[in-house]
């Protein structure tokens, strides 16, 4: 094994530097693919949690699949902790390394030995190996791992923070890799049927994680057209990959699954964007799915007539009144905004950390036609500026945005835990948001009282418990500011050289 270059600066180095090191270490094609699939935003590093968490979570949720991490110990500790905090019920594999094993190539040998030790067909259908920042930047070649050991599939992927901007897109990295593997298996010959069996009707594969009841609601809406709901990607079982590829139509509920969509298109499958959210969204989505399957117009109309009035009734029975800004990193932010607007809310701004893709174009156009500012690859700074500028009755967003909103006395809800944890599709989703939204907006007066009560206790670096009144040292602040400006100018000058 030839010596591998060591990633200088570790995972604390800048994105451009790590990406350049990865390209120099033999991962130029990988970095080019990441750049095309997941275009970066205005910020240097991901503003969500470590992107690898997304791929790790997908692997840990799958039955008979082992997941192994290769990265810095601190990163693996954090990823293991947060995975189990969110309910993982199995161990995370870890291949440790030091500077010597990384540079000499011994790390790859250790990874290969670990995979061989794990490859027990009685326990596993597949083993997923994930390179984190440092091994990717150093060029640890997971593509040289065997495709199969003792009948156990081996899937190696790189999920560096300097190539994959959000943990939501890391789910796509692993989903795309597994679909690519499964597609090769299908092309090679017969494959096992899913444990749940095959539907006797044509199916529609759903792309993107969603509330557990949503696929069932979608299935009910497809039934009048003679269609059935298929597997949901990311999936929970390897055999479901075959069933997902077997569907002639794929619904890109979450539109950022670029790698997965590439595999479906390679298999000749039609992709339909948007989702059956709200009345307008559901009517258009059912029509697009029906046309993709060459369903007769009368059957499409039957499905629309069966659910359109119910959705209108649910929306009318659960109105939402107030100005709401929406932001997050799940990829469903535009769908939520649509539902809020149909429910009566004023939504001046939608920010999503996900990139712009063709599969969200209809949602974007619908929102912009109603005066909504839609921002893809929105940074925390974008979302906070929108919140401060529009002064909403309610701000929906990530944890730091919620924290800032509450400090300003603005009611706020965390998107991931309080919005994604509710049904959005069809009649079930139409009235699902009103109670929590209206209750949160009703807290404005109480938050104002709390803000007034704590006025003057300090904030930022003067917050907390002090023995005396905290001293601000403005001279020291100014001195440090000048040092930082000087360092920034020097760094820019070096780049130009």
Curated annotation (Swiss-Prot):
Q: Which residues form a coiled coil?
A: none
Annotated membrane-spanning segments are 65-82, 126-142, 216-233
Q: Which GO terms describe its molecular function?
A: oxidoreductase activity, acting on iron-sulfur proteins as donors, NAD or NADP as acceptor
Keyword Nucleus on entry: no
Q: Which Gene3D superfamilies match?
A: Nitrogenase molybdenum iron protein domain
Query: Enzyme class, one word?
Result: oxidoreductase
Main subcellular location of this protein, as a coarse class: membrane
Q: Which GO terms describe its cellular component?
A: plasma membrane
InterPro entries, A to Z: BchY, LIPOR_BchN/ChlN, Nase/OxRdtase_comp1, Protochlorophyllide_Rdtase
Q: Which domain of life is it from?
A: Bacteria
Q: Record's Pfam families?
A: Oxidored_nitro
Which key words are in the record? Answer: Bacteriochlorophyll biosynthesis, Cell membrane, Chlorophyll biosynthesis, Membrane, Oxidoreductase, Photosynthesis, Transmembrane, Transmembrane helix
What membrane topology does the annotation report for this chain? Multi-pass membrane protein
| UniProt EC number | 1.3.7.15
- Quote the subcellular location field of this record: Cell membrane
Q: In which pathway does it act?
A: Porphyrin-containing compound metabolism; bacteriochlorophyll biosynthesis (light-independent)
Q: Which SUPFAM superfamilies match?
A: Helical backbone' metal receptor
GO terms in the biological process aspect are: light-independent bacteriochlorophyll biosynthetic process; photosynthesis
- Name the catalysed reactions: 3-deacetyl-3-vinylbacteriochlorophyllide a + 2 oxidized [2Fe-2S]-[ferredoxin] + ADP + phosphate = chlorophyllide a + 2 reduced [2Fe-2S]-[ferredoxin] + ATP + H2O + H(+); bacteriochlorophyllide a + 2 oxidized [2Fe-2S]-[ferredoxin] + ADP + phosphate = 3-acetyl-3-devinylchlorophyllide a + 2 reduced [2Fe-2S]-[ferredoxin] + ATP + H2O + H(+); 3-deacetyl-3-(1-hydroxyethyl)bacteriochlorophyllide a + 2 oxidized [2Fe-2S]-[ferredoxin] + ADP + phosphate = 3-devinyl-3-(1-hydroxyethyl)chlorophyllide a + 2 reduced [2Fe-2S]-[ferredoxin] + ATP + H2O + H(+)
What does the annotation say about its assembly with partners?
Answer: Chlorophyllide reductase is composed of three subunits; BchX, BchY and BchZ. Forms a heterodimer of one BchY and one BchZ subunit.
Task performed by this protein: Converts chlorophylls (Chl) into bacteriochlorophylls (BChl) by reducing ring B of the tetrapyrrole.
Q: Which family does it belong to?
A: Belongs to the BchN/ChlN family.
What name is this protein filed under?
Chlorophyllide reductase 52.5 kDa chain
Source species: Rhodobacter capsulatus (strain ATCC BAA-309 / NBRC 16581 / SB1003)
Q: Which gene encodes it?
A: bchY
